[in-house]
């Protein structure tokens, strides 16, 4: 009898097992060891699992290493290698082809539609897109939010929309002219009606530029950023029957909308002022007093004293004698 060593080299290259799992014949004294039925023994299964993995790796490197196995291609052979499932379930697909996805079909179409002279695409390889630094949306700089830099981008967008709108208007105007021509051919208008129509069209044309100018002014008048400005407020607590004035009222710029509430000194309830004024001198009506004769000494370290000049003159608690300026009773 010939031994394994005397056999040809081809028998050594070909594997002595079928890559697709089949049930081995069981001997007479065999018993079910595992809890789950229809599952093979662990040792034989893991051995087959490692062999299948090795086969798939070798077939990807060089198909000549495993001539019985077909070239590894997920579209032709779908073999799931998972130690938790049985080999018979893993290889149940066999040589059946898998359904192509929509992405693959789209990529093939794009490759076929490529224009002559264009560079050859890299075979459907996908790379992650980087965010453009110059993109106004993705830019995180504060400067990109200002109106001056955003005007160019808005102008380009407006130009595109205007061109589309103008093209649509031209088409609709041509259609209207054709319809009017047909109607006029059928029913000639009297000279009075012609004059009235001409005046109406002239009025509409004159009103359109006025509206566009107003819209431009409104868009420019919009404030992008609403910062806070300091104002002078008058407060009143009904529970404590207490009134106080404060120069620390923070309002939204250009409005009297109070941003922060203030607390009463005794009951600590939050209040909004019942009246808000701009911080200005009562005599010269300016934020910084320009009066020749000032009612008191101006301390540059405490600018609110200067802002409140002439407001509490002659009162029991004046700015000069009060150290805390948050609550001026």
From Swiss-Prot:
A zinc finger (3CxxC-type) spans 231-314. It is found in: Cytoplasm, Cytoplasmic ribonucleoprotein granule. It holds the Pfam family Zn_ribbon_3CxxC. It comes from the Eukaryota. One of its GO terms (molecular function) is translation repressor activity. Transmembrane segments: none annotated. Residues 149-162 have a biased composition (Acidic residues). Specifically expressed in ovaries but absent in testes. Its main location: cytoplasm. Residues 166-177 have a biased composition (Basic and acidic residues). Disruption phenotype: Mutants exclusively develop into adult males, due to female-to-male sex reversal. Defects are caused by early oocyte apoptosis mediated b< the p53/tp53 pathway. Keywords: Cytoplasm, Developmental protein, Differentiation, Metal-binding, Oogenesis, RNA-binding, Zinc, Zinc-finger. Residues 106-132, 146-218 are annotated as: Disordered. GO terms for biological process: negative regulation of translation; oogenesis; positive regulation of oogenesis; translation. GO terms for cellular component: cytoplasm; cytoplasmic ribonucleoprotein granule; protein-containing complex. The keyword Zinc applies. mRNA-binding protein required for maternal mRNA storage, translation and degradation during oocyte maturation. Probably promotes formation of some phase-separated membraneless compartment that stores maternal mRNAs in oocytes: acts by undergoing liquid-liquid phase separation upon binding to maternal mRNAs. Binds to the 3'-UTR of zona pellucida mRNAs, inhibiting their translation. Belongs to the ZAR1 family. Disordered regions undergo liquid-liquid phase separation (LLPS) for the formation of membraneless compartments that store maternal mRNAs in oocytes. The 3CxxC-type mediates binding to the 3'-UTR of mRNAs. This is Zygote arrest protein 1.
């Amino acid at each position: 009898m010939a031994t394994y060593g005397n056999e040809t080299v081809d028998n050594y290259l070909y594997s002595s097992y079928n890559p697709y799992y089949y049930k081995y014949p069981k001997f007479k004294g065999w018993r079910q060891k595992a809890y789950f039925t229809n599952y093979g023994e662990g040792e034989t299964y893991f051995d087959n699992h490692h062999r299948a993995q090795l086969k798939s790796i070798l077939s990807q490197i060089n198909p000549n290493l495993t001539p019985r196995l077909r070239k590894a291609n997920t579209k032709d052979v779908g073999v799931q290698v998972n130690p938790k499932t049985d080999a018979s379930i893993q290889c149940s697909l066999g040589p059946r082809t898998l359904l192509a996805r929509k992405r693959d079909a789209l990529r093939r179409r794009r490759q076929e539609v490529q224009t002559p002279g264009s560079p050859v695409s890299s075979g459907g390889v996908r790379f992650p897109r980087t965010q453009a630094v110059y993109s106004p949306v993705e830019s995180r700089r504060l400067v990109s939010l200002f109106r001056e830099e955003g005007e160019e981008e808005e102008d380009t967008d407006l130009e595109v929309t205007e061109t589309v709108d103008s093209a649509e208007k031209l088409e609709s105007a041509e259609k209207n002219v054709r319809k009017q021509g047909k109607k006029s051919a059928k029913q000639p208008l009297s000279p009075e009606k012609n004059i009235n129509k001409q005046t109406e069209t002239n009025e509409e044309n004159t009103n359109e530029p006025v509206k566009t100018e107003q819209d431009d002014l409104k868009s420019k008048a919009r404030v992008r950023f609403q910062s806070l400005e300091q104002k002078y407020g008058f407060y009143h607590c009904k529970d404590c029957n207490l009134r106080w004035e404060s120069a620390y009222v923070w309002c939204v710029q250009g409005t009297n909308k109070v941003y922060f509430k203030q607390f009463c000194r005794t009951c600590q309830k939050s209040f909004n002022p019942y009246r808000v004024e701009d911080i200005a001198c009562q005599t010269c009506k300016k934020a910084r007093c320009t009066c020749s004769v000032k009612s008191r000494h101006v301390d540059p370290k405490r600018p609110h004293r200067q802002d409140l000049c002439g407001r509490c003159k002659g009162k029991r608690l004046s700015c000069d004698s009060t150290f805390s300026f948050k609550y001026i009773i």
